[in-house]
Swiss-Prot record:
Protein family (similarity comment): Belongs to the complex I LYR family. LYRM9 subfamily.
Name of the molecule in the record: LYR motif-containing protein PHYPADRAFT_186863
Spans traversing the lipid bilayer: none
CDD domains assigned to the protein according to its UniProt record, in alphabetical order: Complex1_LYR_LYRM9
Organism encoding this protein: Physcomitrium patens
Signal peptide bounds: none
């Protein structure tokens, strides 16, 4: 797994902690499962696309629960 992907995973877990307690477990597991799925990605363009989707989805979830 590339360093960029590991860093993105850490950032997502930090954001998960900002969610209401009942939903934290679900989104932490969701993030873990998706990052494991993409752990073999090596192509820089694919990694950029993945990180952009992660950012977009994370922002959407945070707006949804506020």
């Amino acid at each position: 797994m590339s360093q960029a992907v590991k860093q993105a995973y850490r950032e997502v877990l930090k954001l998960v902690k900002r969610l209401p307690p009942p939903s934290r477990g679900y989104y932490a597991q969701y993030a873990r499962e998706n990052f494991v799925t993409y752990s073999e990605v090596e192509d820089p363009e694919s990694i950029r696309s993945l990180l952009a989707r992660v950012h977009h989805h994370t922002c959407w979830v945070l707006k949804k629960v506020r």
